[in-house]
Amino acid sequence: GILNGIDPDYYNPKTDAEVFENYTWRSVARKAHNKTALQRSLALPEREDVPMIALISRLTAHKGLDLVSCVIDEILDDDIQFVLLGSGDAEYEAFFRDLERRRGDKVRSIIKYDKSLSKKIYASADLLLMPSRSEPCGLSQMIASAYGCIPVVRETGGLFDSIKPYNRYTGEGNGFTFSAYNAHDMMYTVRMAIDYCRDTEFKNKFASTIMRIDFSWKSSGEKYARMYEQI
């Protein structure tokens, strides 16, 4: 399918006035400065080396939050940080508030919609989790890519069309994916992504690569134009 697109001028870490520190695909190591600034602002332990997972989403069932709630405690037994931003169903708002209360040394649950803060999180986090049950298009994985935040997604709809799994043998792919709607498949993929992200050289190279993908409306528009020419 032909994907939606994002505005590459608005979602651009080189010029974005709302991130802590600007950077490009050539200076992607500066993402680490954004991470420590975000950690400071959220009162999380300030560590460049700790893998940070972001979940920026409407808190509704079709976004895969039942999978997350099932295994997030096991994932948090690893040395990671988890930052959630979003609002929605009362049961999920309560769950993630309680998760921060229980695991406050490594979790921040910000229960609201905040576009400016979302950009700070994309610029800071190493991984974006999108375990959606259904996702007709999805823009968050494209925004994350623009900021060098590596998508971890379920293979459905627009996520399947836009994110291809990393292949360690060929070096191809622009994220980490799982296909079954299953909490333990998700956890396995998240853990694999975390392990890769502990290698700073790999992580920065991968982030630099995905930052150069053209997810703009211009790219989508050209595909539409070609399609109509063939009719």
Language-model region placement:
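Catalytic cores of carbohydrate-active enzymes across secretory and cytosolic contexts
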Residues: G1-I231
